[in-house]
Design a protein with these regions (language model features):
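Iron-associated oxidoreductase/ferritin-like identity signal
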Residues: 1-159
Length: 159
């Protein structure tokens, strides 16, 4: 299996992961985020497949949709109730996104093809934005616990 095929499989695995998580929550905002991330992973796989087959493709940044959906997420306490292992899920998703980011960076470093460079640079930025989103979800779920555990130690950032 070559690196492009590996990348396609990784994107499709991520799509499956996000669809499973979308089905496991009742929170509309989280469901929307997971569905949007699944669609983005599907788009990434299509871009890579088109490039591998020398077909045309378009690099479209859809991260703005996720930022808008993020505002729809319900109360963080509800998220913890609905998905007891939410922190584990987000940490796993973050690790997966980081692996993708590292893989695309390696592929970028190893290619001399201008078209491949553009694709990998695009995918690196996409994966970075996914990492940021997961970090925000981790912080949102973690902060209530941290706040209670360390409330005596002073002023906390608002969230």
């Amino acid at each position: 299996m070559n690196s492009i095929e590996l990348a396609i499989n990784m994107e499709l695995d991520s799509k499956k992961f996000y669809l499973e998580k979308a089905e496991s929550t009742d929170d509309h905002g989280l469901k929307s985020i997971f569905h949007t991330l699944a669609e983005e992973e599907s788009i990434h796989a299509r871009i890579l497949k088109s490039r591998a087959e020398n077909l045309s493709y378009e690099l479209v940044d859809t991260y703005g949709e996720i930022k808008n959906i993020f505002a729809e997420i319900g109360n963080y306490k509800d998220i913890i109730k609905q998905i007891p292992d939410a922190l584990d899920v987000y940490n796993l998703a973050l690790r997966n996104e980081q692996k993708s980011l590292e893989m695309y960076q390696k592929m970028l470093d190893e290619t001399d093809d201008e078209k491949d460079e553009k694709i990998f640079e695009f995918l690196i930025e996409q994966e970075k934005s996914h990492c940021i989103l997961m970090e925000q979800l981790i912080e949102m779920v973690s902060r209530p616990k941290e706040w209670v555990e360390s409330a005596e130690f002073g002023v906390r950032k608002e969230y």
